[in-house]
């Protein structure tokens, strides 16, 4: 184990730190604004609260660091190193999930960047992908400091009496209030796009030309703004090693394991490795055909298509594939198979990523099976609980009561089988009666036995469990097992200085004493995760209903908006939320809504914003 004395030479600057074990295996890669402070926090009693940290530090024998000029550079370098080394304690596989991109429509008067899930071929420019929304937001946060583009829709900003707080922070140029010309704003937007594409030399060239032109025209204030922007870009431009010359490219590697084909996709943007994605599927044909099929399947989705796709092996007749990709992208796309140099090294890195992902999938599957087997034994179940459902209730003193059902298959969320229930037959605060109604609707007569779960979990103790077992008994459902997961309780004795909590307990039918699983064990963490997901899903639905009711009450209180006009508004916009977001012009287009009524409606919905430059123009649904 490493000692705290060995980190005294760490600088107080931004950078990336790499933790290794005695065999020089990379265990963890992290970034920090202040390297010395961050590393020292691992040794402090009040340090990092993640439970893995105590196990991590017991194995760490060496910590190395790489100093960067900016936090943004550290963020990008951290992601690059994680993709390269796949450290055990950074492990957070996001396979087959939606990634995020940044979108900017340059055809609008004042383009803005937004985070989106799908890349559509609508003429806008897309940047990414990013493995999480938080990664995309981190990039935006740094970008706004260099290129102060607007953050919100123009209509939203114009409702305010003066520019928003971001303008005061110099992170928005306030085009909504005429603080910048369209020409200058478009220069910022183009600079931001080139910056995201890694074309920093082009940005500096364009901005130097604009600075010179402004100075020649004796527009010295404008020239000074470009001068400051150029200096900021020069300071912020990443010193990260460029791994390949050229523009954007995707590098593909694969690993075959029996009938399972594992594919790794590395994203290079502006010559820099920015991310990766892994896929796995059954494939009985040869590898060449498998890669060709993957290209077809992947790039025909709504994804970004780069100018070059680098393959580990040649595919039969690549020209038609190139032509199709060119048509989809609207520009030239080349498919290459490198034989030497940096691109061959990148292909080898992609192959290594595919091998690692395959091993991790296999290990995760074996671990998941072991967890389910432990649950079967500890809860005395008759079969392995491959399909688990969990239910929860959310209400405020019986008002707007809702129920939720979440489903997990082999320990993973099966969101296609999530369900929400609006409780209709219970008018008072009676959770047991609400659960009885929800279970009766879920297991109503005629439900196919194939649709039954192996195990049902209820959020609660013996009372909630009894409701479930009575409903199952009344419906003569005998092949579904049940359990109640009761949260831990606070145990505080008089005079005690610390608060202690009891263990979480699992109640079973026809058993007086609950089963107590070892705290922080994998089986208990799985049950708790399922229980918490059911609670989240129920609360989210309840908040949505509360928001709708609030807006409906607002509509009813507006003079001139009767039942007929409310129905017409809902028919036109489709939801109460969209009514609240509508512009004055959009309200005027509704049949039966005159200009006077539309103005009254719009003012009523946005009256809280007057005098508050940072107030949200929308009803808070969350």
Swiss-Prot record:
Keyword NADP part of the UniProt annotation: no
GO cellular component, one term: excinuclease repair complex
One of the Pfam families matching this protein, by short name: UvrC_RNaseH
Molecular-function GO term, any one: excinuclease ABC activity
SMART domains: GIYc, HhH1
GO biological process: nucleotide-excision repair; SOS response
Domain spans labelled UVR: 201-236
InterPro entries for the chain: DisA/LigA_HHH, GIY-YIG_endonuc, GIY-YIG_endonuc_sf, GIY-YIG_UvrC_Cho, Hlx-hairpin-Hlx_DNA-bd_motif, RuvA_2-like, UVR_dom, UVR_dom_sf
UniProt xrefs under Gene3D superfamilies: 5' to 3' exonuclease, C-terminal subdomain, GIY-YIG endonuclease, UvrC, RNAse H endonuclease domain
Family listed: Belongs to the UvrC family.
Annotated protein name in UniProt: UvrABC system protein C
Species this chain originates from: Geotalea daltonii (strain DSM 22248 / JCM 15807 / FRC-32) (Geobacter daltonii)
Gene that this polypeptide is encoded by: uvrC
